[in-house]
């Protein structure tokens, strides 16, 4: 993926960083990988709103940018695992800060806290 050149621009470090984690899913993927190495299916289950195609695309972009490491095992069936790279790991405080900010401003952001989502009964289930 070709990256923009942000050198010699005011705010370039912020713009370049946001460009790396832009979009709806990259930050969420990085958040989930903070808990350790995961396979594609595990990530997909943690993010029910993402399509298989989009998850594949986002994982490739994060790998191309050096934020995650993809490890393929020579097994049948094939096994592929993803984990944070050292540079991806260095984003941990950034992702944690975004999470904390989101938790403080949930009502304003119109999103339910995780506990409410987990505890909410399914529609039509007694």
Language-model features, listed with the residues they occupy:
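Residues within the DNA-recognition helix of helix-turn-helix
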Residues: 58
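N-terminal helix-turn-helix DNA-binding core of bacterial DNA-binding proteins
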Residues: 2, 8-54, 74-75, 81, ...
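C-terminal regulatory/oligomerization modules of transcriptional regulators
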Residues: 1-9, 64, 69, 83-126
